[in-house]
Amino acid sequence: MGATVDPITATGTHPRNVDGQAITIAVFSSVKWSGRIWLPLLFWAVTLLARVEAWLRRPPGTLARLSFIHFARWTLVRRIPYNGAPQQKEKLSYPRLFFESNFNGGWEEYIDAFSHILTKGMILFWGTSYGFPQPKPTAPFKQYIKENELEASHFYSAYPQATTTMVLAAHDLERKFDAFKGRIEGATPDAFAEAWRAFLSEVQADL
Amino acid sequence: MAAADVAPVDRADIQGNILRAYGKAYDRTSYVFTHLEDPAGGREWLGGLLSQVTSDQERPDPKLRPDETLNVAVTYSGLQALGVPADVLKGFSDEFRAGMAARAEILGDTGESAPENWEDGLGTGQAHILVTINALTSQLLERALDALKAGVEAAAGVTIVYHQPAQLLDEVREHFGYADGFAQPAIVGVSEHKLGGGIPEEGKWRGLALGEFILGYEDEDSLPPGRRLPSAPAEPLGRSGTYMVFRKLAQDVALFRKTLREAAALYENGDEEKLAAKVVGRWRNGTPLVSSPDAPIPGFDREDMSNNAFRYLDTDIDGARCPLGAHIRRANPRDALGWEGLDDSGLLAYRHRIIRRGMPYGPSLPEDAVEDDGEDRGLVFVCFNASISRQFEGVQTQWINDGNAFHLGHDKDYLLGDSSTTNKMTIQGKPPDPPFFLAPQAAFVKTRGGEYLFVPGLRALSAIAAGRWQ
Amino acid sequence: MSNRAGQATAFMAITPIVAGKEDELRAYLDGLSQDESPFALLPRTHFARWVILDDWNDEKSQPKKDHLLSRYLIFTSNFDGDLSSYLDELCDKLAPQAGELWGRCVGCPDGAAGEALKEYLMHNKINTGFFVAAYPHLRVGDVKRALDTRARLIDFAVSSQGMRPAELQSAFNAEFLLTDGSR
């Protein structure tokens, strides 16, 4: 009698949620009355903040700097669209907060990062959801996420072998490489070699 | 959490060599795996061993230390072979129940390191009980082994399926020539004096909660108000126990030396020793690169705790001293995964610590030899942790077999690689010096076999031997 | 309400699965492989997925239990540029798949393609509240090109180590200037 265990990949989540290095997570949580008012306000505020930061060219906020997240979104589902019979009209007793994200690394590490680094952020977004335990201790919080997580049926990444840090490094590297190519036009071999060494030193964090 | 809040450690109930190492005087070890044909016979044999099992109890006089120590661990198939019922078995962790061979993909044990290529007896479910004997001399080890074998002969349905002897090398180094076995975790109530072994906080180090290593105690996640204990098998089996990882890792010393030699030709005028230090993050005598980037400290004392109290972010954020992908920086990042402006910079690393108690095996390759002599040599890697998946597997999958956490893409640990190949390794240069690259190449280390085991506390062992499960 | 982050867009549609067709739909999704994902036909797509929502999960602390009357197919996508032209592409390129998936949903137009399908998806759209992207200005093509350049640069940096200047320069030119269309 072998132990029957769910197929767990190195990422700690079901294989269907994984494409190469990319991991996806989707969570629905039921939202209290207070959330109906709070969440739209929150979304408006953080969206505005993000736009202001972009306009001011200030470094992006903590969430965007968590270097293993490609994309993340929160959505409040208040009603399910109706398409006529034979669909039955849904009446939601509670709106549902939908969270979706694509990231790298392990599922556990991802949730840990939210617990430790985005602690206040967690409470802002999930504080009005039923059953939301505190971000720490992490064990009940991970349990909560697991219970409310939806497994993907088909998940696609356009660049599955790349992690977010690789994408950011590649982008930074490309810019600097273009500048380098401009600098070495018509250079002698010795000047080229020196410039190459200087370039490698400049981009070593991207390699 | 302060030491005063913590439950006192029941040292007599915890097996030895976990919280406190037996020490380098015990320089000979044998790892003996047995197979149990019959539950009753197996339990009886286990019962016969109980009085010899060495605990973590304080010895009143260190000079009265025993000639040898004996410890017992059990695989999942071993628990089944002992007759542990299904509802009790469910309390053990998923990865332990699956076994190390089933986790091969995750661990990077593919190609030549894949379980189908492992040595007979390991990874097939045949290995049930691991008896580890440490002794002060080889004669004492022989004597203890003979006694064990006699007991196995006399017992009903017990056979030895695997035996690996091991012994410390000179200066407690491992086969690639690096000082090993030190810089272990600092644990509250046990070893807080190990500066640098705990969690880096603002200006100080905090010991890790005991429950990160021993079941039945609060771990780092046991926060107020609930202060819940981490999940563990139910009493009496769970308390004072821990999970153990056993991996026989064969090392190709000749290949490693040859690779370093060839690569060093282009590195800083052939400084092979420095290149060797860059791969690991410590000079061969144990001096950390972060503390002393240009030369090892002569007579470096690895037992001096203050030598281990270094961090990365304050002086070496870019890896100019200790490369970002160096072995020790990967295996224990300390504050290196820290977050800008965050006080508790060790928070993304602190729940992945392990206690290492492995031993080298096989004869040393003569110094300066760069051709393999065909001898089997390497490291019996042994570690202890409360959660194999979070701790050992977490380190192996996220930090050793991948580089993303360190912004190194898919670069793996250059020393361990994986079964087929290492990737490149970038050795960061101090501006204006450019980085130096170690080219991808065949792996120096191969997995020859392994098991996940449970190390019961002493009362738990008695209960198992008596068939008393609840 | 924010469906955009930089030039990237988030889209979500929830469509009710025709009663009795859930197993077929699920089987079809199970049969899709990531290596030959239909989404590869939409090169503006960074990440996308289909998820089946069987029912809500209820928390113990909820006063009432909530149950869905149908099963739903959820489609989410993170892609480049504006929604309207993306849906045009989807309704054109993904016609066969659309039939197998949305074709099994209530209210889907016959043929599951073109303008009618686009209207159907827009009708079932759920607007995103807050959308964050790590690289909001990079399109899929930008990402892939940069990743490729990085891989080639790394290979070159490793293999050219120790070359004398003249050899280094000519090797560099051969790798990056003659074969690389864009200087």
Model-flagged regions — what are they?
Chain A
Residues 104-139:
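An amphipathic, aromatic/His-enriched active-site/gating alpha helix that lines ligand/cofactor pockets
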Residues 1-73, 78-81, 90-96, 102-109, ...:
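Short S/T/G/P-rich N-terminal loop/turn motif that feeds into the first structured element of a domain
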